[in-house]
């Protein structure tokens, strides 16, 4: 049976193979829906079972992690590493620690990462990993013991030319350091096998800022192409972690008035807009073990919408930076009715397919995460380059390279998604990333 004779038959094939992996199926549907007209015009990409190979990870590693907590009780977690596609380079993608982590989510993230990494023009394949371990409320000793226990299995599957993980939700510089240290201990090798490391042992300047900065660089390029800009715009940001914090900082530098931030408990609204002082305090509060956005709102006398997302606040630009599927169709309708001009994804797939369709139908500029938030992995690639050369670049050089890469990604999206009146960035990003990966797979034969 030819699964690629139509879009629906191919999506049914994916669903039938993994019927309980809804997040992965959603990611495949989003990509293939925009790709299919291009595939019909270029049938060579449907030969040699290329599409079937593209949606099947090269390797999935699942393992048990046993560790001892502060009460001397043995705890058991599950962990995975999805090595999705290495056609253009070693597997590259973050590690996520969160109770919601499962194989479907990691396959979706690895699939998206494959195209995102291709868009950066750097030689990196796609992968993703993580565990259902929850670092919230854990002591530093517990986090360290978990990371070290995880690496006793994972280390054998990593290497600078094989698989180079990084951080993600629940995995910051501390966790990366613990894992990188244990990797060095077990392998007796100090080669670069993690990015997002501390500056004292091979990290890169601008890496913590890169995803948020890159998001704003891409969004500014998108706005400029359509006669707009951040200057004077009201901006809603969701989330209050790393990506959100640096997106707020860079948007402020571009002249925007950022009026929201959020966490899992609610949203803070600041009609006057963030200032450098307020942002610094937000970062301090969120860095504490039990930091809550409600405390920040109370300190500055701001409105706090408990249990609410930021999408009901009238804004010109929305930057979802929290988690997948946070912006649904109802939220999209509210934003559209309030006159939103642009939406750019700082998180991975934070916008549902229905919401994305509504934005595109309404003529709202929409930047998908695989393009807009590629700055983090792009700077990870720059960190790998610095490690390989045994060099460290100045912050200005890394930032300039990041800005250049984001403009290149924007150019690729326009090349494949350009239209007379408005660029379809979803189509452009999907086709541009697909073509690079597919050409590499075809060139390497059936393997």
Protein language model annotation of sequence segments:
Residues 1-205, 439-445:
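N-terminal ligand-binding/catalytic initiation module
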Residues 2-22, 27, 222, 336-447:
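Adenosine-phosphate binding glycine-rich loop
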Residues 11-12, 29, 33, 103, ...:
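Predominant activation on well-ordered alpha-helical scaffold segments within soluble catalytic domains
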Residues 72, 168-169, 204-211, 236-240, ...:
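Active-site nucleophile and cofactor-binding loops and adjacent substrate-binding regions
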Residues 162-166, 190-194, 237, 260-263, ...:
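General beta-strand structural signal in soluble alpha/beta enzymes
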Residues 198, 203-312:
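Glycine-rich phosphate/diphosphate-binding loop of Rossmann-like nucleotide-binding domains
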Residues 266-366, 371:
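Rossmann-like adenosine-cofactor binding region
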């Amino acid at each position: 049976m030819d699964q690629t004779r139509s879009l629906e038959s191919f999506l049914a094939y994916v669903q039938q193979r993994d019927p309980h992996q809804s997040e992965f199926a959603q990611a495949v549907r989003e990509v293939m829906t925009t790709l299919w007209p291009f595939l019909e015009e270029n049938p060579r990409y449907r030969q040699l079972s290329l599409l079937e190979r593209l949606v099947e990870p090269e390797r999935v590693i699942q393992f048990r992690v046993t560790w001892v907590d502060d009460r001397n009780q043995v705890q058991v977690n599950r962990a995975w590493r999805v090595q999705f596609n290495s056609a253009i380079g070693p597997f590259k993608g973050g590690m996520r620690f969160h109770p919601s982590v499962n194989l479907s989510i990691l396959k979706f993230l690895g699939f998206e990462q494959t195209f995102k990494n291709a868009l950066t023009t750097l030689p990196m394949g796609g992968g993703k990993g993580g565990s259902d371990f929850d670092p919230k409320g854990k002591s530093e000793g517990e986090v360290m013991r978990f990371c070290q226990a995880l690496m006793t299995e994972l280390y054998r599957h990593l290497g600078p030319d094989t698989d180079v993980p990084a951080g993600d939700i629940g995995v910051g510089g501390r966790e990366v350091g613990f894992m990188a240290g244990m990797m060095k201990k077990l392998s007796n090798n100090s080669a670069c096998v993690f990015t997002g490391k501390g500056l004292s042992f091979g990290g890169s300047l601008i890496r913590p800022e890169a995803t948020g900065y890159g998001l704003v660089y891409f969004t500014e390029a998108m706005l400029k192409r359509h006669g707009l800009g951040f200057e004077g715009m009201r901006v809603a940001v969701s989330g209050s972690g790393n990506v959100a914090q640096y997106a707020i900082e860079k948007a402020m530098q571009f002249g925007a008035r950022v009026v929201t931030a959020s966490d899992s408990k609610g949203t803070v609204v600041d009609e006057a807009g963030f200032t450098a002082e307020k942002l610094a305090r937000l970062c301090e509060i969120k860095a504490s073990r039990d930091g809550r956005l409600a405390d920040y709102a109370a300190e500055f006398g701001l409105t706090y919408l408990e249990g609410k997302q930021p999408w009901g606040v009238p804004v010109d630009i929305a930057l979802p930076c929290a988690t997948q599927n946070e912006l649904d169709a109802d939220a999209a309708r509210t934003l559209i009715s309030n006159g939103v001009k642009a939406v750019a994804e700082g998180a991975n797939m934070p916008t549902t397919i229905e919401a994305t369709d509504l934005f595109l139908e309404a003529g709202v500029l929409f930047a998908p995460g695989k393009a807009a938030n590629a700055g983090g992995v792009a700077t990870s690639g720059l960190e790998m380059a610095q490690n390989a050369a045994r060099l460290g670049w100045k912050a200005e050089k890394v930032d300039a390279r990041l800005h250049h890469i984001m403009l290149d990604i924007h150019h690729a999206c326009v090349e494949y998604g350009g239209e007379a009146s408005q660029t379809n960035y979803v189509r452009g990003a999907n086709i541009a990333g697909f073509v690079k990966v597919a050409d590499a797979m075809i060139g390497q034969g059936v393997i």
